[in-house]
C-alpha cells in the first residue's frame, strides 16, 4: 500500500514537471483588489423578444431595444430550425451577407457573431440571450433543408434594427 502511494506521488511529480513549464497547469495568483461596480451601472431590464420560425421565414419585430435581449425562438414549421444572430457592419448589406454566404458556403469574415440557438425540432422552442448595441443585425437559420438548399436561400433570414 505504501509503495503504491509512493509510486503515485512520483508519477504526479513527474507529470507536474512537464505540465507546469508548458503552461498547462497554472497556479492562481492572489487577487490584490476587486473592481466593484455601483448598482446604478448594472443593467436593470432584459427585453424579451419572441421570434416565430416557420418553413422558411422569421417573424419578429423589425426594431428591437438596445441592451440585453432574451430571444425565444418558437419553431412553428415542419423542419428543423435554428437562429444565429450577427451584427451587420455599416459598410455591408444583407445582400452582401447572402451573396458571400451562399457562394463561399461559410459566414463572411467581416460578420460579427453574437450567438446561436440550438437546432430545434418542429413545435419546440429555444432561448438565446445577447447584449445588443444600436445598429443593424441579421437573424439567420444556417442549416440546410432536406433538398440541400440552405434555409437562408429559401428566405429564412431577416434584418432587424436595434435602437
Placement of each model-derived feature along the sequence:
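Extracellular/periplasmic metallocenter environments
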Residues: 34, 50-53, 57, 62-66, ...
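Positively charged n-region of N-terminal signal peptides that target proteins for export
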Residues: 1-4
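Bacterial N-terminal signal peptides
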Residues: 10-21
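Charged, glycine/proline-rich intrinsically disordered loops and linkers
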Residues: 105-109
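Contiguous segments within soluble domain cores/interaction surfaces
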Residues: 68-69, 75-104, 143
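Signal peptide processing junction and immediate N-terminal pro/mature segment
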Residues: 22-35
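Proline/serine/threonine-rich low-complexity linkers at boundaries of modular beta-sandwich domains
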Residues: 43-48
Amino acid at each position: 500500500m505504501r509503495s503504491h502511494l509512493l509510486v503515485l506521488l512520483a508519477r504526479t511529480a513527474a507529470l507536474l514537471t512537464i505540465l507546469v513549464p508548458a503552461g498547462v497547469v497554472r497556479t492562481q495568483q492572489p487577487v490584490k483588489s476587486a473592481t466593484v461596480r455601483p448598482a446604478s451601472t448594472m443593467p436593470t431590464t432584459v427585453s424579451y423578444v419572441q421570434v416565430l420560425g416557420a418553413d422558411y421565414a422569421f417573424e419578429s419585430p423589425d426594431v428591437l431595444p438596445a441592451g440585453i435581449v432574451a430571444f425565444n425562438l418558437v419553431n412553428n414549421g415542419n423542419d428543423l430550425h435554428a437562429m444565429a444572430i450577427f451584427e451587420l457592419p455599416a459598410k455591408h448589406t444583407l445582400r452582401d451577407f447572402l451573396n458571400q454566404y451562399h457562394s463561399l458556403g461559410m459566414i463572411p469574415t467581416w460578420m460579427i457573431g453574437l450567438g446561436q440557438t440550438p437546432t430545434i425540432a418542429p413545435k419546440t422552442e429555444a432561448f438565446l440571450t445577447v447584449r445588443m448595441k444600436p445598429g443593424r443585425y441579421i437573424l439567420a437559420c444556417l442549416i440546410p433543408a432536406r433538398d440541400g438548399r440552405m434555409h437562408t436561400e429559401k428566405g429564412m433570414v431577416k434584418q432587424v434594427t436595434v435602437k
